[in-house]
Amino acid sequence: MKRLFPIIALCGLLFASCSTQRSAEPRRYQTLHQKATVTLQFDQRQYSMAATVQVWRNELIILSLQPMLGIEMVRAEATKDSVILIDKMNRRYTVLHYDNFQKLVTPAPSYRLIQDFVSAPQKPNIKTKTEQSFEMGNHKIAIACSFTQREYNTLKSPKRLDLKKYKQVSLREILPL
C-alpha cells in the first residue's frame, strides 16, 4: 500500500494537469467596468495616465481619464452614432459623428471598433493589453490600454454628464493639432 499511494497520487496529478487549455474568449456581458492604464503616444510625445472604462454593451462607452491624483479631467462618451469629448477642466466639449471621423482619422473608428478595443478578451489573473494606431493628418497617434481590473454586470444605469454646464467648441480647440 505504501508503494501504491505515490503512484496513485502521481497519476491523479497527471490527469488533473492534462485538461484542455481555454482560449481567452470574450465573456457575454451587459455591462463592464474596468480600470486601466492608458498610454497615448502623439508624434514623439508620450503620456500615461489612469483610466476607468464603463461599457453598456451596444449602447454606451464612457472612458474617464485621470492624469493625476485620480481626478477626472477628460471624459469621452461613445454612443452608436457619435463620440462626445469632454474637457472637464476647462468646461468645454465637442461632438464627433462617426462619418466625420473618416475625414480626420485613418482608419476611421466605429462604435464596434471602440467596443471591441475596450472589451478585449482577458484571461483570468493576467493583465490584458490592447493597442491601436491612427493617423490624423500628419500626426501619428498610438493608444495602448493595460486593463488591470474587470467587473462584469455590476453597473446600473449610465451616469452621463449634463452638458448644459459646458460650452460646445470645435475639435481643434480641445485637441490643438
Region roles according to the model:
Residues 61-111:
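An acidic-aromatic
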